[in-house]
């Protein structure tokens, strides 16, 4: 299978369509927030583009040129007073009107609007998902299926049974594994990696019957004659049904808990970038990897797509707040530096910083794309 065949197998037409929709809507709302906060402070927005690249269609409305561009991979807004202006002598200088004339807090409000919108989308999508589908109960391992003829079937385990304790110890919400926080229900796997006698406390809820609790004890050897042994179950976290309020609280908690993971993921990406290490990991995907994940989610269920959209918006919010010139976080940093100095940076200083930041972001994007494509060689 050549490279193009491998990519075609990974990226389905429906998946590509959903990728364009999810990514396009997320970036469109991000840019719309910048637009709204600028207009709310009396700053003109020269153009608003849905998509990138060559303009396919444009229309002037309310002082803004609204564009539809060729590539459905995002969008942008051109806010008056953000870009350098050329004077009558052909010299470029920093603007003094529009965005440039706003106080520091006003500029930060415009710049923060985009990432905060993605964050609110994250919380909103997560709240809807938790309200409809329930929240994961990480302290309970729900058996999803039992293989016919397996050891688990012989022990009387069934799909729908819930393991609540292992060897007399209640399963915790989370546990530490190798210095990292892991879900408690995954302790089932750890138990099955150890030889000896194990006891699972199992709850079974028959329809219309009270919950039954029983102890399932068995002797276990992880390997026999060099062959890995399998209990014969597929399991995941149990689910608790909650109302909107609890779903929102859980969404906030989940988002806060995800921040250290995002920091670690992007730190790892930057290390790989600076060392030109294109080896794969599961932490950060480029556009092709993201489209592949969305293709798989589209084949599963609408709720799988909601989960991917949630993660994408959280990643967009976090990435845009990284203090790299050219990103919202970098622009906010420059505003703060100017406020602390009591005067703006010179035209040459700001241009050099922004050009360096833009080049870094473009090279990082190219690196991620190359790393994505390298999987198919």
UniProtKB/Swiss-Prot annotation:
The lineage of its organism: Bacteria, Thermotogati, Deinococcota, Deinococci, Deinococcales. This is Putative zinc metalloprotease DR_1507. It comes from Deinococcus radiodurans (strain ATCC 13939 / DSM 20539 / JCM 16871 / CCUG 27074 / LMG 4051 / NBRC 15346 / NCIMB 9279 / VKM B-1422 / R1). It is a multi-pass membrane protein. Residues 109-198 form the PDZ domain. Zn(2+) binds at residues 30, 34. GO terms for cellular component: plasma membrane. GO terms for biological process: proteolysis. Its EC number is 3.4.24.-. Disulfide bonds: none annotated.
């Amino acid at each position: 299978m050549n490279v193009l065949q491998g990519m075609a197998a990974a990226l389905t037409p429906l998946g590509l369509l959903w990728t364009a929709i999810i990514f396009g809507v997320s970036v469109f709302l991000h840019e719309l927030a910048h637009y709204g906060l600028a207009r709310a402070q009396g700053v003109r927005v020269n153009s608003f583009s849905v998509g990138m690249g060559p303009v396919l269609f444009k229309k002037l409305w309310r002082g803004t040129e609204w564009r539809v561009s060729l590539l459905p991979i995002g969008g942008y807004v051109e806010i008056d007073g953000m870009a350098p202006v050329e004077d009558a002598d052909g010299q470029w200088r920093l603007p003094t009107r529009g965005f440039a004339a706003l106080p520091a807090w006003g500029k930060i409000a415009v710049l923060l609007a985009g990432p905060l919108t993605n964050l609110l989308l994250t919380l909103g999508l997560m709240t809807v998902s938790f309200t409809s589908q329930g929240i994961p109960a990480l302290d309970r391992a729900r058996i999803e299926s039992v293989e016919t003829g397996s050891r688990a079937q012989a022990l009387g385990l069934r799909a729908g049974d819930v393991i609540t304790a292992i060897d007399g110890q209640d399963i915790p919400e989370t546990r530490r594994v190798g210095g990292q926080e892991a879900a408690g229900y995954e302790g089932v796997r750890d138990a099955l990696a150890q030889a000896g006698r194990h006891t699972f406390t199992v709850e079974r809820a028959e329809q219309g019957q009270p919950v039954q609790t029983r102890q399932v004890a068995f002797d276990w050897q992880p390997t026999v004659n060099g062959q890995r042994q399998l209990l014969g179950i597929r399991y995941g976290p149990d689910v608790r049904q909650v109302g909107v309020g609890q779903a929102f609280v859980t969404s906030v908690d989940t988002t806060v808990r995800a921040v250290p993971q995002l920091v670690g993921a992007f730190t790892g990406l930057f290390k790989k970038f600076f060392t030109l290490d294109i080896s794969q990991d599961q932490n950060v995907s480029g556009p092709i990897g993201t489209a592949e994940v969305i293709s798989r989610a589209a084949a599963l269920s609408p709720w799988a797509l909601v989960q991917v959209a949630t993660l994408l918006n959280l990643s967009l919010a976090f990435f845009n707040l990284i203090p790299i010139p050219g990103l919202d976080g970098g622009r906010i940093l420059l505003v703060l530096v100017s406020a602390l100095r009591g005067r703006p940076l010179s035209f040459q200083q700001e241009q050099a910083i922004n050009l360096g930041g833009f080049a870094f972001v473009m090279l990082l994007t190219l690196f991620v794309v190359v790393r994505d494509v390298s999987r198919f060689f």
